[in-house]
Amino acid sequence: MMLDVAPPRFRVEEEDERHGIFVAEPLPRGLGHTLGNALRRVMLSGLPGAAVTKLRIEGVQHEFSTIEGVREDVVDIILNVKQLKFRLERDEPIELQISKDGPGEVRGSDIELKADVEVVNPDAYIASLSEGGHLDMTLTVERGQGYVPAEQNKSDADPIGVIAVDSLFSPVEKVQYRVSETRAGARVDLDALTLEVFTDGRLGPREALREASRKLIDFFGLFAEGYQGAGAAEEPGRSGGRPVITDERPIEDLELTVRSYNCLKREGVDTIGQLATMTEEELMNIRNLGMKSVDEIRSKLEEYGYTLESGRE
């Protein structure tokens, strides 16, 4: 299909920290929609980011509480906290503190930061304190991808007063694409694909497009002849024992919940191949990884043709 088409060109029409317009042309007719839709979907739901997953406020037992000297009730504070955007350069969860006395407003800039973490929107409003008011709050920030409801962020190990919140990890706010006609030489039936990407500042638009492209390349590699990234192979001369699985795809491709993903990363489990060689008992021995998470991992592995006990079926 590509033999009689000039090599496609990529160009940047507009770009700043949060917005970019990118064009690829000429493409064979129909391929513009194929690529545009795939890239759009991956950018919106398949890229990792960092967000608040839990919070704890001194003196508060549950989310339907009020705090003396604070204008907002806890429900409103949670809604405001969910708007905070973070860059986190570590796989492990991190706890951040806010401690402020009134009168005055509490904003993202009042968060006491640690190494490897940054608040992208420090002007984000959290609460207002009156004279004598005080807010002492701990935020748990984790990496993940897509949208994770509060229920999945809960843990039986959480002490009383820890409130799980909905987390929107995706750094991409909106993606639009359009396909127009273009020409190359005598050919006039070709596609020009224009992608417009809006991010929230945690990731630049060109970087978002690049990361989405890499993810798609990894998945399309499954169907390419001679692809070596997936499948199980037994070591030469080895009989019995645990199989060696050479699936180098990252565990991010499994789209696990935040808890399962972070527990595995802390244990150094980075690829699907590593995970597929593990047993249920080994997973249960990982700190904070309960039976619910093990069941989730088993289900995800089965979608890829693996079992916990014996690797590829």
Curated annotation (Swiss-Prot):
Q: What is its EC number?
A: 2.7.7.6
- This chain belongs to which protein, by name? DNA-directed RNA polymerase subunit alpha
Pfam families membership: RNA_pol_A_bac (PF01000), RNA_pol_A_CTD (PF03118), RNA_pol_L (PF01193)
Q: Write down the CDD domains for this protein, in alphabetical order.
A: RNAP_alpha_NTD
Q: Which InterPro entries match?
A: DNA-dir_RNA_pol_insert, DNA-dir_RNA_pol_RpoA/D/Rpb3, DNA-dir_RpoA, RBP11-like, RNAP_asu_C, RNApol_insert_sf
Which species is listed as the source? Rubrobacter xylanophilus (strain DSM 9941 / JCM 11954 / NBRC 16129 / PRD-1)
Q: Which UniProt keywords are listed?
A: DNA-directed RNA polymerase, Nucleotidyltransferase, Transcription, Transferase
Q: Which family does it belong to?
A: Belongs to the RNA polymerase alpha chain family.
Q: What GO molecular functions are on record for this protein?
A: DNA binding; DNA-directed RNA polymerase activity; protein dimerization activity
Q: What is known of its domains?
A: The N-terminal domain is essential for RNAP assembly and basal transcription, whereas the C-terminal domain is involved in interaction with transcriptional regulators and with upstream promoter elements.
Question: What reaction gets catalysed by this protein?
Answer: RNA(n) + a ribonucleoside 5'-triphosphate = RNA(n+1) + diphosphate
Region (Alpha N-terminal domain (alpha-NTD)) residue spans: 1-227
Q: What does this protein do?
A: DNA-dependent RNA polymerase catalyzes the transcription of DNA into RNA using the four ribonucleoside triphosphates as substrates.
Subunit description: Homodimer. The RNAP catalytic core consists of 2 alpha, 1 beta, 1 beta' and 1 omega subunit. When a sigma factor is associated with the core the holoenzyme is formed, which can initiate transcription.
Which top-level enzyme class is recorded in the Swiss-Prot or TrEMBL entry? transferase
Give the UniProt entry's GO cellular component terms: cytoplasm; DNA-directed RNA polymerase complex
Q: Name one GO biological process term.
A: DNA-templated transcription
Q: Which HAMAP family match?
A: RNApol_bact_RpoA
